């Protein structure tokens, strides 16, 4: 019989004032935020937010503004915020950009922009302009008018508070277990020839500490830019956290990148060795390089006859180097009964490590548990994505970069822009 284990759960989110709330319970989380606030309230310079919209939406905008104002104060504990309105005349780039510039010139901490409908080229041109300028949040009138406004605003503000520099919640994990840092890295293709590399440093509690992306380069340049992007992200992280000792390091490699497995692993090992020599990580650092993959032929069932749903957090051993990990919650019908369906797991392959044989079994399960926990971290809303942030966040970046490039937006480059390097602008 195939070997498997279940991740020991009991995981909670930590929010403000040292309070904890259970994961996957939106009601309890919102209640906890109201009572105790987020884990970290953003530090604002102006206490001003710009709400940019067209006058034809005025009735709905009044409701929206009221909800944003009350929830920022009562749920997110950001007090004395003023929301200023800026009106654009027509849904064209120049008209909207002029109001964006006016808002920035008056001194605001962030911009919330309501568009009439989904216009892909306009959206990505505006989005890229704003990403390079100021924290922002987009909304669409057609969605605002057709959805539960309270639910929509609740989830939207999770993203916006994060972009402003706040931390809604973190994972309440054992500080003695897991990695000192996790690096989510890899590349994503823009087209058949070009790609860009990414690297993000995470704490084990799911917080992103630093991120870098490369310029768009050709596939033949992948390995060169993979190394340089990882080194940049670790340098940035260490410059900001000079006393942070890295004795346990894990690399989560993902993305649609060129198939050069051996060359890729060789470069990643070389990169770790160079980081050791430059004392960016401990000279005795214990590390593992993992391939995390959603696209594979495997499915997991609860039993051979598919009568039971596989438990969330099931770790299935395919070999000593490859595991499957189920991240999904069972789907419940309205009557509360479980709908039995096979689950598409995450494939985790250990392509390289420097663990001893005595450490191996323990460390494998520790990093698998860590991946499962990181799948419960998501600041795009109150529902977890069921994909570790080390993979999910780069996927979000990839979608933005690819579409900005496709639709002629402004190039996005976090290098030298501390706000983009340390805050999740891609949410």
UniProtKB/Swiss-Prot annotation:
GO terms for molecular function: DNA binding; metal ion binding; RNA binding. Residues 150-155 are annotated as: Binds guide DNA. A divalent metal cation binds at residues 159, 427. Residues 38-167 are annotated as: Mid domain. Residues 147-148 are annotated as: Binds target DNA. Keywords: DNA-binding, Metal-binding, RNA-binding. InterPro entries: Piwi, RNaseH-like_sf, RNaseH_sf. Residues 118-124 are annotated as: Binds 5'-phosphorylated end of guide DNA. SUPFAM superfamilies: Ribonuclease H-like. Changing residue 163 to A: Reduced binding affinity for siRNA. Other ligands are provided by nucleic acid. Residues 168-427 are annotated as: PIWI domain. Its cofactor is a divalent metal cation. Residues 110-406 form the Piwi domain. Homodimer probably stabilized by DNA. Each subunit is capable of interacting with a DNA molecule. Might play a role in defense against invading genetic elements, using short nucleic acid sequences as guides to bind complementary target strands, resulting in slicing of the target nucleic acid. Binds nucleic acids with decreasing affinity in the following order; ssDNA, ssRNA, dsDNA, RNA-DNA, RNA-RNA. Association of the 5' seed region of the guide strand (nucleotides 2-7) with AfPiwi increases affinity for the corresponding target strand; the greatest increase in affinity is for guide DNA with target RNA. This is missing the N-terminal and PAZ domains compared to other prokaryotic argonaute proteins. This is Piwi protein. It comes from Archaeoglobus fulgidus (strain ATCC 49558 / DSM 4304 / JCM 9628 / NBRC 100126 / VC-16).
């Amino acid at each position: 019989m195939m070997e498997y284990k279940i991740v020991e759960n009991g995981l909670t989110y930590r929010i403000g004032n040292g309070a904890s709330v259970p994961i996957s319970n939106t009601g309890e989380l919102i209640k906890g935020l109201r009572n105790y606030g987020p884990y970290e309230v953003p530090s604002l310079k102006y206490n001003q937010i710009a709400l940019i919209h067209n006058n034809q939406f005025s009735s709905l905008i009044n409701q929206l503004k009221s909800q944003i104002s009350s929830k920022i104060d009562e749920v997110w504990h950001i007090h004395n915020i003023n929301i200023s309105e800026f009106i654009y005349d027509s849904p064209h780039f120049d008209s909207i950009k002029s109001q964006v510039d006016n808002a920035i010139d008056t001194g605001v901490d962030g911009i919330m922009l309501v568009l009439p409908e989904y216009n892909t080229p306009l959206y990505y041109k505006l989005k890229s302009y704003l990403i390079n300028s100021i924290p922002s949040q987009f909304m669409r009138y057609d969605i605002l008018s057709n959805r539960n406004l309270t639910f929509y605003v609740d989830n939207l503000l999770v993203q916006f508070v994060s972009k402003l520099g706040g931390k809604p919640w973190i994972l309440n994990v054992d500080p003695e277990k897991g990695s000192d840092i996790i690096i989510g890295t890899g590349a994503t293709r823009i087209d058949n020839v070009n790609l860009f590399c990414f690297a993000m440093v995470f704490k084990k509690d799911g917080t992103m500490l630093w991120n870098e992306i490369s310029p768009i380069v050709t596939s033949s340049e992948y390995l060169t830019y993979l190394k340089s992007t990882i080194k940049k992200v670790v340098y940035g992280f260490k410059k900001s956290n000079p006393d942070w000792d890295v004795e346990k390091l894990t690399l989560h490699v993902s993305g649609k990148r060129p198939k050069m497995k051996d060359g890729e692993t060789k470069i990643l090992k070389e990169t770790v060795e160079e980081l050791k020599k430059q004392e960016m990580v401990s000279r005795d650092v214990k590390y593992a390089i993992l391939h995390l993959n959603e696209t594979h032929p495997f499915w997991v069932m609860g039993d051979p006859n598919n009568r039971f749903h596989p438990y969330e957090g099931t770790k299935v051993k395919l070999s000593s180097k490859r595991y499957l990990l189920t991240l999904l919650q069972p789907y419940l019908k309205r009557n509360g009964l479980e709908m039995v369906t096979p689950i598409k797991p995450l494939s985790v392959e250990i392509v390289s490590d420097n663990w001893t044989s005595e450490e191996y079994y323990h460390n494998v399960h520790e990093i698998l548990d860590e991946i499962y926990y990181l799948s419960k971290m998501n600041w795009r809303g109150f529902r977890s994505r069921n994909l570790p942030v080390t993979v999910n966040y780069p996927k979000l970046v990839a979608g933005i970069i690819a579409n900005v490039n496709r639709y002629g937006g402004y190039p996005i480059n976090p290098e030298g822009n501390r706000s983009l390097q340390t805050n999740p602008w891609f949410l």
